Amino acid sequence: STNYSEEEVLKKLKKYAQKNTVLKSFIGQGYYGTIIPNVIKRNIFENPGWYTQYTPYQAEISQGRLEALLNFQTLVSSSTGLPISNASLLDEGTAAAEAMAMFYNATNAQEKNKFLISTGCHPQTIEVLKTRAEPLGIKLIIDNENEFIFDNSIFGMLLQYPSTDGNIADYSNLIADAKNHEIFTCLASDLLALSILKTPGELDADACVGNAQRFGVPFGFGGPHAAFFSTTEKFKRKIPGRIIGVSTDKYGNRALRMALQTREQHIRREKATSNICTSQVLLAIMSSMYAVYHGPNNIRTIANNVNNLCHQLSSSLKDGGIKIFYKNFFDTIRFKPNNDWEKLAHNEKYNFRIYKDGSIGISIDETTVQEDINKICNIFGVLKTNETSYYNFPKQLKRNSSYLEHDVFNRYHSETEMLRYIHKLETKDLSLNTSMIPLGSCTMKLNATTEMVPVTWPEFSDIHPFAPLEQVRGYLSLFKDLKSWLSKLTGFDDCSLQPNSGAQGEYTGLLVIRAYHNSCGNKHRNICLVPDSAHGTNPASAIMAGMSVE
């Protein structure tokens, strides 16, 4: 074994980082470039007063964080038009799977075991749903939503709004038809798009999920980011994860706490429908503060700028004789190029989404500027148009409802105001820069300063999760070494870095055990023994893996 000083660790990490190649990515697929306000980066992301706090089981020492998370829930509910929101989930794929499980558990009829998924959903989301559905006996039907056929065996459906290819469709009639067949609908959506698009709530969806990453959290090669989940009152006792509620203390003062905990795994155990425990709270706080700092007007300005630049690119390509797949879009277009563009894109250090049929997807984001549009037009051999246009989607889908009206989103728009607000909340919380936190459980770990420093290096933070493998050699080398070290530490032959939390690790392990028994022809071996002293996620994970608990 080798012992490294902190300085040597940073040098070793820098060597990993230097093997990565940072290009500007227009890949989209749920992940977008964002500008992190420095007041948030410096005073939350790099501040141990925020990143060393423990799970807020004790509300008395967590009031600052609980307020920041309540802001996140308010952001999500206002954006989606649905009254109940949690704070938060692990990623969009997990959130979609949780929505599917929630709908399934809310269905009384035993014959309802089919779930419809639009091919317009992000591919990685569909893959997560495949994994989560099989142990529960849920049958997935993946098709174009226009080909959906409703019958009594279907309990729910998932639609992407806007789609992974950028298309914006009016799902009102489809959702209404689903309701007539007692089928629940979840929309996977985008927070920035929803600032100017009609809300899922107004479309009468039962739930909405998505990734909050583009609200001030870097790519990080895929994470960590906070996912969001909102739903109707009907599901408030079935929604997964933490819900922050407003209450009063014994003196009658306003106080915040985790609400409706009796539905969660640490209380319901094997009767829980989800193993979600803590989940990306620091990132949820960053996204909520992004919304607080920008406020509704500036967020809509960012959205309109993104939509306008996307329109300029679309119009330029069309004028150059290139067919755009969809006429209605927010930030993403798909088209079939008619020139050899690869070398030009490489020279400009741009990444685009490449489909199997040779078509290209380009997603515009907050970091995109006019010069980028000019260069992209040049790459595909067309002249740029100066045409300006907003709301490049059907008029009936333009948002007219209120947005982020709460006072907290309309007060702190200067650096000084924001700095003071962040500090005020920080002082209401207990963290390692105040005292030790002797609460045990699964979350007792030190986030050392030396660990946090490299996280903000561009070579790590600015890599899109679907960047070509030749651009992420540093990450791949880091993963290889980490897997080797963890295997030696645990005495196993190999390990997986895929699970996004301890609870997801349990679930993954149980799926491996289940797959082994199935491969040996022992499908009947489906009982999982869990001691009473086990963490609540253990029995919940076993149920999700299709096992019974004793």
List the predicted regions and their residue ranges.
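Gly-rich Lys/Arg/Thr-decorated short loops/hinges at beta-loop-alpha junctions or inter-strand turns
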Residues: 47-59, 77-81, 110-112, 140, ...
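Long, charged amphipathic helices and adjacent flexible linkers at domain junctions
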Residues: 147, 254, 384-404
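Conserved C-terminal alpha-helix-loop-beta "cap" of PLP-dependent enzymes
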Residues: 297-379, 387, 419, 425-430, ...
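Conserved phosphate/anionic-ligand binding catalytic regions in large, soluble enzymes, centered on
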Residues: 217-230, 234-235, 279-283, 430-451, ...
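N-terminal entrance/gating region of PLP-dependent enzymes' catalytic architecture
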Residues: 1-71, 77, 267-268, 395-481
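Short loop-beta-helix segment that forms the pyridoxal 5′-phosphate
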Residues: 24, 57-61, 65, 78-97, ...
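Conserved PLP-enzyme active-site core in the AAT-like
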Residues: 94-255, 317-318, 330, 347, ...
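Active-site C-terminal subdomain of aminotransferase-like
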Residues: 215-316, 320, 325-327
